[in-house]
């Protein structure tokens, strides 16, 4: 019963349910509106032009549709006047009010969401040798995927995460199902690491599946690039943040 609960409804599992995305994006809008109001009041003191960009679909458009920053850029948001630099922010629950965290280069991870489909041969659990088990194969794949980060990446340079968050397969305790699918997420702060993770993901999934005589398919669902802070602009803005917030409140 939170006071800011959304009144919107959506369909989930065939039923109408309340829908809310409580990531703080309403705060982003309020912050940008307030910034625009303040800068408008001192516009004669600003040696240049400032453009305020309100981005819809901040976390991506619905499947099959265009939206977010990519569509805005395509439609000319960075033109007339041309944009030389962009500064943005994201609220963070781990920081107290008045505190700022920033760093040069990668600050928020790239996201790649994927689906793995496995197809075997259904059989009764009492005679597993007469079928091909996608559940055993899935277990081997999940375990093997954990070695991507721990054994294939230089973690002293940047972090990365590979997560399987959802597995769906089977309907009874004594039936080995024909198929199964898994949903997962990759997060990386370095493009070379991302390429390595994607390469190793495919090697592991297809080779483990083949070793179990299982058909496998990987589908990439969503891809967001790294949020990257230009090192020059980072150095330019740092003194201002320290002056406004106090050095002790700026975390690097």
Residue ranges of predicted features:
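Active-site alpha-helical elements of protease catalytic centers
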Residues: 21-39
């Amino acid at each position: 019963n939170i006071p800011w609960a959304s009144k919107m409804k959506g369909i989930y599992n065939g039923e109408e349910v309340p829908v809310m995305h409580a990531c703080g994006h309403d705060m982003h809008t309020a912050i940008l509106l307030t910034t625009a109001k303040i800068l408008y009041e001192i516009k004669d003191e600003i040696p240049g032009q400032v453009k305020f960009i309100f981005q819809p679909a901040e976390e991506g458009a619905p499947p099959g549709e265009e939206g977010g920053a990519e569509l805005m850029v395509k439609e000319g948001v960075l033109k007339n006047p041309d944009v030389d630099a962009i500064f943005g922010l994201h609220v963070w629950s781990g920081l107290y009010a008045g505190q700022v965290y920033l760093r040069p280069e990668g600050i928020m991870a790239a996201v790649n969401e994927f689906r793995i489909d496995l197809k075997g041969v259904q059989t009764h659990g009492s005679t597993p040798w007469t079928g091909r088990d996608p559940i055993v194969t899935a277990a081997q794949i999940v375990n093997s995927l954990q070695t991507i980060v721990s054994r294939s990446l230089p973690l002293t340079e940047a972090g990365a995460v590979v997560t399987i968050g959802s597995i769906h397969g089977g309907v009874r305790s004594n039936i080995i199902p024909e198929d199964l699918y898994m949903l997962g997420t990759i997060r990386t702060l370095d493009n070379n690491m991302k390429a390595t993770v994607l390469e190793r993901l495919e090697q592991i999934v297809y080779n483990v599946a083949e070793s179990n005589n299982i058909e496998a398919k990987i589908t990439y669902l969503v891809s967001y690039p790294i949020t990257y802070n230009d090192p020059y602009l980072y150095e330019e803005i740092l003194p201002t943040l320290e002056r406004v917030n106090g050095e002790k409140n700026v975390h690097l």
